[in-house]
Amino acid sequence: MGMGLGFGFLAMALHWESFVHDWVAPWGTIFMRLLKLIAVPLVLVSLILGVVNLKDIRNLSRIGLKTILIYVCTTILAVSIGLGMVSVIKPGKVFPKDRQTEFMERYQQTVVEREAQMQQMKDESPLQFVVDMVPENLFKALGDNSKMLQIIFFALLFGVALIVVGPSKVPSLVRFFQQLNLVLLKIIDFIMAFAPYGVFALMSALIVDYAGDVGIFSALGLYALTVVLALAVIILLVYPFIMRVFGKRTMKQFFNAAAPVQMLAFTTSSSAATLPLTLERTQKHLGVSEEVSSFVLPVGVTINMDGTSCYQAVAAVFLAQVLGLDLTFGQMLLILATATISSIGTPGIPGGSIVMLMIVLDSVGIPIEGLALILGIDRPLDMLRTVVNVTGDMTVSCVVDNTKK
């Protein structure tokens, strides 16, 4: 990653931007595609095996309920930290007013597109996200990485059916999934061997894309710092505390295991793409049982978005400050509730978190046009949010595993 950063800055200095885009960036794209290629079958197979390994419906319901409750609690805590940090620092109070019009014009088209998506979601039934969990066609869902909730639903349904039928009655089917899982893990080994080159390409392309626009970073510097500080509190204080008290792992052990996962999450900005490595590090280096990690981690990829929820809270209050709006305590609570719920209902579409942020803004009366002010710096912050998301997944898996014993 460091070499990718260095090469990116070197390319900027030597005006090699076109070379990076034409000859370096494609390798990063290939690496991302390989990760996404393996993510869906891995979630399906690992979750089915995770359910089957629980051996009993009561174990599944107990662990499932515990997992969801812990995920919701950490999300509420993450949003609260974001609200507290942005309320204390007040980055919106120092945003240069002369840059508002410039940013509004630059990203207006993106805002319009996201607004249309938001309006479509608002017109749907409140239970639409539940409807969307149930696939009409399994193979269609398997061919679309954005349908991860549908894949999880089918995997849980299939796993429960296997338990009810009895694994002893269909040993060849259970053995098939176990052997398929071994093959998938070997494919993951192949992909991870390519990881250094893929990360190098991704970081080089990122620097070339963003280093030239210093204006965005100078205008949004305090806002970005607020987001980073809030995420740092979660990842450096909250998770280690939870891990130490409830997960019974030392901070050193935890971060040694999580570091490669965090690095991959930072470069890919995708929890799903990071899942293969997350499973491997959680099982082998944190000692979490396969039955727990195979269930908790795939579920967490979809519903645990601590970093994203924290970011939404900071962004909403920041925009209110920039636009001169004073939020009441009740509106703060509404942001807390909306951001928490959206962590489960975030759509699996490009810019899905931005669409959900629009709903958060709309719920408290903040003009959604203000979103244009922060879109320019969203990608770097998205990388950091993903680091928090995957770290939270690993933390919760350790807690569930420890409390199961």
What residues fall within each predicted segment?
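Anchoring transmembrane alpha helix of integral membrane proteins
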Residues: 1-47
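Signature of multi-pass transmembrane helix bundles
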Residues: 5-16, 32-35, 66-76, 80, ...
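Membrane-water interface of transmembrane alpha-helices in multipass transporters/channels
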Residues: 16-23, 61, 176, 213-221, ...
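Transmembrane helix boundary and interhelical junction motifs in multipass membrane proteins
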Residues: 39-43, 198-199, 270-278, 292, ...
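Juxtamembrane helix-boundary/capping and inter-helix hinge elements in multi-pass membrane proteins
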Residues: 52-59, 94, 165-171, 179, ...
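Membrane-interface alpha-helices at helix entry/exit sites of multi-pass transporters
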Residues: 59-66, 186-190, 285-300, 329-330, ...
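Helix-loop-helix junctions within the multi-pass membrane cores of secondary transporters/permeases
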Residues: 260-343, 396-397, 404-405
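Transmembrane alpha-helical segments and their short flanking loops
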Residues: 313-405
